[in-house]
Amino acid sequence: MKSNYAVIVAAGKGKRMKMPINKQFICIQGKPILYYSISVFSKNPLVDKIVLVCAEDEIEYCKQEIVKKYNFDKVVKIVSGGKERQHSVFNALKVLENCSVVLIHDGARPFVTDRIIEDGIKYSNMYGACACGVVPKDTIKIKGKEGFSYKTLVRKELFIVQTPQCFDYNLIYDCHKKLANNKVQVTDDTTVAEYFGNMVYLYEGSYDNIKITTPEDLIIAENIFKTHKYI
């Protein structure tokens, strides 16, 4: 029987955080950000296995201080990241065995919910590729080279894509394999799928499902924890 996998990507250096440790290991309410990101997938009955991606020099730390310390039994492998995010994801995809649906998630997004995970699996089975996200709250403009606005986009047609981004395994593996032979750089996995002509279904995420990237995000995250009791 095939399994649903979560691939949690935690290999980034997080330079914008301007802290001596990687952002995934910063503690909120006494636990690392990465703990919360893994925990939701670990507890969800529809997720069978988890593969964690981290920097090569942090594999042992993740194994001891995250996986073993918090008894994340669903984490079956820890693989090293690559030069760019797309290489890190492909490294993980290559080790998945007998996979049906794969959910690719940022390690620095601790507020993913069961509903988002379960919808991702459902829509992956229906459409082959999907991603959660939200409609922007602000008006979005395109800025010209000289600094002036030259176009205002229709807000209701825009979508801020989050993670998890969820796929039929064979579809996204084949796309990443083809991409590895090109010199195209992408910032997320929906772009990988779209690059090779696949449609990606977009479904409702959450405004709480933020990626913690800057010191300001840490303040927002602390408030989300206190308000919604994610602990």
From Swiss-Prot:
Keyword Transferase present in the record's keywords: the answer is yes
What single Pfam family name could you report for this chain, choosing any that match? IspD
Task: Give residue numbers for the site Transition state stabilizer.
Answer: 16, 23
Alphabetically sorted, this entry's keywords are: Isoprene biosynthesis, Nucleotidyltransferase, Transferase
- Which catalytic reaction applies to this protein? 2-C-methyl-D-erythritol 4-phosphate + CTP + H(+) = 4-CDP-2-C-methyl-D-erythritol + diphosphate
InterPro entries noted in UniProt: IspD, IspD/TarI, IspD/TarI_cytidylyltransf_bact, ISPD_synthase_CS, Nucleotide-diphossugar_trans
Q: Which CDD domains match?
A: CDP-ME_synthetase
Q: Where is this site: Positions MEP for the nucleophilic attack?
A: 155, 211
Whether Transferase counts among this entry's keywords is: yes
Q: GO MF annotations for this entry?
A: 2-C-methyl-D-erythritol 4-phosphate cytidylyltransferase activity
Q: Name one GO biological process term.
A: isopentenyl diphosphate biosynthetic process, methylerythritol 4-phosphate pathway
Q: In which pathway does it act?
A: Isoprenoid biosynthesis; isopentenyl diphosphate biosynthesis via DXP pathway; isopentenyl diphosphate from 1-deoxy-D-xylulose 5-phosphate: step 2/6
Q: What does this protein do?
A: Catalyzes the formation of 4-diphosphocytidyl-2-C-methyl-D-erythritol from CTP and 2-C-methyl-D-erythritol 4-phosphate (MEP).
Q: Which family does it belong to?
A: Belongs to the IspD/TarI cytidylyltransferase family. IspD subfamily.
The name under which this protein is listed is 2-C-methyl-D-erythritol 4-phosphate cytidylyltransferase
Source organism: Clostridium kluyveri (strain ATCC 8527 / DSM 555 / NBRC 12016 / NCIMB 10680 / K1)
Please state the gene responsible for encoding this protein. Answer: ispD
